[in-house]
UniProtKB/Swiss-Prot annotation:
Pathway: Carbohydrate degradation; glycolysis; pyruvate from D-glyceraldehyde 3-phosphate: step 2/5. It holds the Pfam family PGK. Its EC number is 2.7.2.3. Substrate binds at residues 21-23, 36, 59-62, 119, 156. Keywords: ATP-binding, Cytoplasm, Glycolysis, Kinase, Nucleotide-binding, Transferase. GO terms for molecular function: ADP binding; ATP binding; phosphoglycerate kinase activity. ATP binds at residues 206, 294, 325, 352-355. It catalyses: (2R)-3-phosphoglycerate + ATP = (2R)-3-phospho-glyceroyl phosphate + ADP. This is Phosphoglycerate kinase. Belongs to the phosphoglycerate kinase family. SUPFAM superfamilies: Phosphoglycerate kinase (SSF53748). It is an enzyme of class 2 (transferase).
Amino acid sequence: MAKKIVSDLDLKGKTVLVRADFNVPLKDGEITNDNRIVQALPTIQYIIEQGGKIVLFSHLGKVKEESDKAKLTLRPVAEDLSKKLDKEVVFVPETRGEKLEAAIKDLKEGDVLLVENTRYEDLDGKKESKNDPELGKYWASLGDVFVNDAFGTAHREHASNVGISTHLETAAGFLMDKEIKFIGGVVNDPHKPVVAILGGAKVSDKINVIKNLVNIADKIIIGGGMAYTFLKAQGKEIGISLLEEDKIDFAKDLLEKHGDKIVLPVDTKVAKEFSNDAKITVVPSDSIPADQEGMDIGPNTVKLFADELEGAHTVVWNGPMGVFEFSNFAQGTIGVCKAIANLKDAITIIGGGDSAAAAISLGFENDFTHISTGGGASLEYLEGKELPGIKAINNK
């Protein structure tokens, strides 16, 4: 069933509670990456135009003790959002109480208010993270309708997403709707042929994604640290490269059953130490020297992966191809980014996390159909799970 979206609601004069994902990185109180705020703007601007009164909720980091509160306040987000919207955003440094209730009552049509970090409530018995029913009910009492636009927490059952939606008519924001359309589309109704590119350090992080996508994708390209477990499963020499011994049998089984679908690196950039300044050698992937470790896919692999992408109608990528934080070992990830960006007729999706960070930091954010804002949420969606935050949105 299609989910309700914000444009299905009558918003004029209504107090609209919006769960956004403003869980942005901060350094010394300054926002270092505003992508999540930018992604939330279309929904906020639409509600302003429709004459709604907006009450925004978000978490920021993990609040474990009282001393965490000062460094995990949403005040910098309110200031940034105010600049982006070119209007005052009322910031209430509380998560409940008379001050918050009075500020909400004072809102006029088109006004925007941001509630303090929802995880401040976790200091008292983890009320937010454990979806305390009274907290969800209280927050719901502050508004007329609820819009969930926080895909990044859709895999969590928290008071500020699932809890509120239990008591109010709930619709997806435009970002959430986009995530359902693109990430959900890969799993539920993909435009074939589908190529999945999986990277990152560990097979264990992606094991359920692989199990699900192997039945959907026409090809699964495997790079990053996780590739070495697959190469080892083929009996190849991987030196001191990252290896998950307990996943070799899984890799063997997958290669036996679906070997025709799986594409592995043919050459590897290796080094003796885990450092950007280490001496680099490119070797065939089946003969990595005993004292060296794979740090990135090699140039022949970049070409192979690019060739495998040709003709794909849907491409989903999750996980970098090497240690992209080191500039000398970022070429594999850059090469894959370029290859996907060049596919003009394909739906190209980055499933959040490190690969999204890599694409954005490398300047490719406008070259993909969709870059997901979810890390864990994207992975669980690609695993084929029903996410609680999405389940709680009303059907049309």
